Structure formats: structure tokens, C-alpha cells
Amino acid sequence: MTYHEMYRSTTLGTTLREALDEMLAHNLLQPGMDHKVMQKFDQCISNALAKRVKNRLSLRGHLNTYRNCDNVWTLVMNDVEIKDSSAIMTVDKVSLNSPLICKI
């Protein structure tokens, strides 16, 4: 199974990348090992979010654009109302990215 690299741009992903770069610069990590660590990060973060996150949100707004590239859906919505169990928030624009997950 392939995992998407979208979580590498999160705070956790960028911090990990910076730590790996520093370790490479000080010869504390073998060349190429950083790629293996990042691939494992992609796998672990995807699995953890799929299994452990149970919170739900409701979104209502106007769909501006949508696209599917490399099995990742991107939805851009305007004037969005976001609801969870305790609060309601309204924002001007939301961009959602989600990998397409198919189980056979």
C-alpha cells in the first residue's frame, strides 16, 4: 500500500524533516536513512489518524472547485459553516484534501 506525503507539511512532519537534516549534517544518520524514516512517518501518521481520531465535524458551504489528482481529492468551499458537538464556526474559505481509500 502506498501512503501520501501530505502530512509532511504539518508541524510534526516539518520538525521531523528538520531533525533528520540536522542529523545528516552531523553524520549521525546514514545517507538514505532519512527517506526510510519519512516513508515510515507517512505510514504511521496515516494509520494513527485513521484508527485513533474519532471526532466528527459537519461542514456546510458552497463548493467552489473540486479535483482528484493521484487519488487525492481536493475540495475548495466558500462561506463554510463548521459544526462539532460543542461549537459552530463560520469561515470564508476552506480547502480539504483527502486521499482516496479503497478496500477490496
From Swiss-Prot:
Subunit structure: TFIIA is a heterodimer of the large unprocessed subunit 1 and a small subunit gamma.
Name under which the protein is recorded: Transcription initiation factor IIA subunit 2
Keywords: Nucleus, Transcription, Transcription regulation
Species this protein is from: Schistosoma mansoni (Blood fluke)
CDD domains: TFIIA_gamma_C, TFIIA_gamma_N
Single Gene Ontology BP annotation: transcription initiation at RNA polymerase II promoter
Cross-referenced InterPro entries: TFIIA_a-hlx (IPR009083), TFIIA_b-brl (IPR009088), TFIIA_gsu (IPR003194), TFIIA_gsu_C (IPR015871), TFIIA_gsu_N (IPR015872)
Residues passing through the membrane, by range: none
Stretches assigned to coiled coil: none
Domain of life: Eukaryota
Compartment(s) where it occurs, according to its Swiss-Prot or TrEMBL record: Nucleus
Similarity-based family: Belongs to the TFIIA subunit 2 family.
